[in-house]
Amino acid sequence: MNMPVSTPEELRACIAADAQTSPSTYLADDSFAAWCYDHLSLSEARSAFERDADPDECEQWELTALEWKAQVEMAIIALTAAARMQ
């Protein structure tokens, strides 16, 4: 079992080190990144990343705007890696 990562950089490193493992396994199950991975398409996640942090999501997930952005970026990284595996 993989330990969840907490930054986009850590996620990139894990995926680079083990391209055969599903990238979603590196996301904490209860994280906003995992929620985005499970509920958004890659294009939806990219669109979210290009706008300001959603204040309602920040409140719900107890994230700062910068943390929100990092979580969305992690979902994008994981979704991109998953698409490459197919």
Where are the regions that the model predicts?
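Short intrinsically disordered terminal tails
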Residues: 1-9, 77-86
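N-terminal acidic leader/helix
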Residues: 3-31
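Acidic, low-complexity, intrinsically disordered interaction modules
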Residues: 21-79
